[in-house]
Amino acid sequence: MPIITLPDGTEKKYDSAVTIDQIASEIGPGLAKAALAGRVNGELIDTCIPITQNSHIQIITSKDDEGLEIIRHSFAHLLGHAVKQLYPEAKMAIGPVIEDGFYYDISYKDTFTPDDLLKIEKRMKELVNRDYSVGVEIVSPEKAKEVFTDRGEIFKLDIVKNIPKNEIIKLYKHQEYIDMCRGPHVPNTRHLRAFKLMKVSGAYWRGDSNNEMLQRIYGTAWKSSKELKEYLSRIEEAEKRDHRKLGKKYSLFHSQEEAPGMVFWHPKGWTIYRILEDFIRETITKYDYQEVKSPQVVDRSLWEKSGHWDKFKEDMFTTTSENREYAIKPMNCPCHIQIFNQGLKSYRDLPIRLSEFGSCHRNEPSGALHGLMRVRNFVQDDAHIFCTDEQIQEEVQNFIDLVFEVYKTFGFDSILIKLSTRPVKRVGSDDIWDKSEKALSEALDSKGLDWSLLPGEGAFYGPKIEFSLKDCLNRVWQCGTIQVDFSMPQRLNASYIDITGRKQTPVMLHRAILGSFERFIGILIENYSGNFPTWLSPIQIMIMGITDRNNEACFTAKDKLVDFGFRAEIDIRNEKVGFKIREHTMQRIPFLIIIGDKEEENSEISVRTREGKDLGNMSIDKFKLIIDESISKKGIQGNQS
């Protein structure tokens, strides 16, 4: 006789085992129709699974966060059902939920084309319209092995063989199609309405390049057609803002096959890069950082001591010279410790904050490379703070101020913060972990910030805080990090003399604001859609003469504006001024100056903005006040159209 306790405290008594489906039906037909799964004593189960003991339950619908994940996972199985009907020879591997949707890895002799995706999507809709029930059967690994052997599903068998014999496996049945999963899944296909298949890519089985390359079909799924439409609209807008397209359109950078994962910066793009670097340098100087420069190529012995050789050797570029093996540095931290180690340090010297715009190389897989967002050569706005245990909280507080100052400058006001704490496998005493985690959490609380806790997600050498920003499309980009490190300073013999005269190992705080310049510029390009605020625009002013006889006045105006410190260019091509205005407006240049006979006669300029606003005629000195004000707004100007 199980006693079922509902979320509002109501108790229901039953003479025998009962299911979520039955409980929902008793409460009301609307809830019964909406029920996707149940949470029973904290565990998610299918609506048809019998509950035999006293339990606290919650009925999960699409309104719950878990509901959307269940819908998406069920769509992966529906995709498998459609694929097996259309392509019976296909072998199904895995189909998990991902952000915004799902995918399924499939082995098939032919490459899936866009037309194939349309065909599969059509079949999925037909299956949904059949409004069939999704069955579930709990079996042993041995039984599952029989089922998938009969069906020739080699990848399912590979998974089953690694499941202990005493565990159970859930088989989900979409009519004649059978798949395996932890579940739960929707009880009926009527819950599967709003979806779209998006693309196909390649993926190695189990992520191992020695295994077969599979075809990964991606799909997106939502609770309603309205949400699906909104998502597809965001995707369409994101494609328009793709930094690779805009990089080409505005001649900012390019990549090419001869240097995969490396960036060819064009003059305009490099101007943005230098402005960004100068801004970060100027800002961190106010926070008492000392800039350093460390070697690009370092003997493997240092990487062995730091632990990177064992953990990251495959991701490092190496070279040999005079029988010595070197690595092109993938990160700056071991080198910064070498700088710290030069000369005796006292507790009075701490904290020491060493910063570097360090060029790093990592041997990322070619398939993972993506414009500026994922590269092999990148520059980090990297710094390492050497401090005592007692100084951690204050240093983290200062870094929080720094991060928010920088992000606000670019117009990013929505910042997500996560604190990751100790994992099971870790170095350092519980006491130092307690102190560090407390220091980080109290630093966040002291700033009145909302943050979320990720228990067990910290690195083995210390807890960390991650800062992620939301762009104008509500996409989340993880950029800033401050990471406590108890391990590396000890491995590389960093030390200082404490107040008692004893040698102690400092704590090292790894920290970055942007993450990498390349990626952050990619984020900015997409966020602004190439419409950079005046202070970041590679060309701030374009000067155009109406006729050739105005050219000299154009050069005079340019010289004066450049002397003021502005980035001004001249267009004296033999083209109509209207054509030039349209062209430079399309290039998103903030201010356009036109000089004709009238302007020249009155020692004035005619000023227009890239938004098409005519500011009228004025002196260059008056224009200087306008552009100074525009520059001072920085990211607050935030024209992201």
Curated annotation (Swiss-Prot):
PROSITE patterns linked to this entry: AA_TRNA_LIGASE_II (PS50862), TGS (PS51880)
Cofactor: Zn(2+)
Textual note on the cofactor: Binds 1 zinc ion per subunit.
Enzymatic reactions: tRNA(Thr) + L-threonine + ATP = L-threonyl-tRNA(Thr) + AMP + diphosphate + H(+)
Top-rank taxon: Bacteria
Keywords of this entry: Aminoacyl-tRNA synthetase, ATP-binding, Cytoplasm, Ligase, Metal-binding, Nucleotide-binding, Protein biosynthesis, RNA-binding, tRNA-binding, Zinc
Coiled coil (UniProt feature): none
InterPro entries, per database record: aa-tRNA-synt_IIb (IPR002314), aa-tRNA-synth_II (IPR006195), aa-tRNA-synth_II/BPL/LPL (IPR045864), Anticodon-bd (IPR004154), Anticodon-bd_dom_sf (IPR036621), Beta-grasp_dom_sf (IPR012675), TGS (IPR004095), TGS-like (IPR012676)
Residues binding Zn(2+), per UniProt: 333, 384, 510
E.C. designation(s): 6.1.1.3
GO molecular-function terms, A-Z: ATP binding; metal ion binding; threonine-tRNA ligase activity; tRNA binding
Localization, UniProt: Cytoplasm
Ranges where the TGS domain occurs: 1-61
Entry's Gene Ontology BP terms: threonyl-tRNA aminoacylation
GO cellular component: cytosol
SMART domains documented for this protein: tRNA_SAD
Quaternary structure annotation from Swiss-Prot or TrEMBL: Homodimer.
Similarity comment: Belongs to the class-II aminoacyl-tRNA synthetase family.
Protein purpose: Catalyzes the attachment of threonine to tRNA(Thr) in a two-step reaction: L-threonine is first activated by ATP to form Thr-AMP and then transferred to the acceptor end of tRNA(Thr). Also edits incorrectly charged L-seryl-tRNA(Thr).
PANTHER family: THREONINE--TRNA LIGASE, CHLOROPLASTIC_MITOCHONDRIAL 2, THREONINE-TRNA LIGASE
Listed name of the protein: Threonine--tRNA ligase
Gene name of this polypeptide: thrS
